[in-house]
Every structure is written in C-alpha cells, then in structure tokens.
Amino acid sequence: MRIEAVVEVRFTEDRGKVLKALQNVFTPVSIEEKPSESGVLIVATCEGYTCLEKLRSAIWRQGIQDAARNVISKGIVSENTIIFSVNKQAAYVGVVSFVTETNESPLGPITFTVKTNNVRQFLDWLAPRTYRGRVYYEAPPPD
C-alpha cells in the first residue's frame, strides 16, 4: 500500500502549524515541498498501513466509523485507489472532520490518495461497519 497526503501551506499560514496538522493524522516517511500559486504544497508519502494509524485511532476515538466509511467509500476511484480529504484546521487539534465539498475547508484540506491491492479490506480496517455502536467486523491491516 502506498499513501500520499497533499496539503497546501498558504502565504498567510504558519508552515509549522500545517505540518503539525498533517502529522496529527499521518506519519510520513518522506516530505517534499513544491511551489504553488498561493503558497507551497507539502507532499508527504509512506508505504504501508502504519502511517495511517493516527487517522484510524482518531476515527475510532471519535466513534465516527460509519460516517468515515460513508465518506471514504465515495472516494473510491478505481479498484485499487481511494481519494479522500480531511479538514486541516480540525486535524491541527487532533480531530478528524471529512471534507466532501471543494470549498468546505476555507484554508484547503489535507487530501489522501491511497493505492492498495484491496480497497475493501483497507476500508474495513480504517473505518469498519458498526452495529448499534459496536464494530461489526474488524479486518486485519491491509497490504
């Protein structure tokens, strides 16, 4: 599995705070910076599920598995790729809030692109189905 997280640091933002927001939900192995029209793009990458443990823990801690599953499943773009976004400001304080519309996050979201051999297993691991508030089936970590 390969994960890429992209977040924009606008000219009006503090780079350190944006990095903190990213690192509150993602543990990257490498970070690159690329210039953009309104600031700098931070592109963070990682191989394997462990870099998403913070995101998964936050989803479980907040008890939003079903909502997360609903939003993330709408981001399935192929049999091996999922794209979803979380609010950068919420991530800064350790909270997961999914972004479903382009303008929903005024300072821009953190956008994740996940490439995996088994999209369903990834979804079942990150945000499993629940029944009456309890996890129905917890899948093993994906490839």
UniProtKB/Swiss-Prot annotation:
Gene3D superfamilies: 3.30.1440.10
Family matches, as InterPro entries: PAB1135-like, Ribosomal_uL5_dom_sf
Pfam families per the UniProt record, alphabetical: RNA_binding
Domain of life: Archaea
SUPFAM superfamilies per record: RL5-like
Sequence similarity: Belongs to the UPF0201 family.
Name this polypeptide is given: UPF0201 protein Pisl_1658
Source species of the chain: Pyrobaculum islandicum (strain DSM 4184 / JCM 9189 / GEO3)
Taxonomic classification: Archaea, Thermoproteota, Thermoprotei, Thermoproteales, Thermoproteaceae
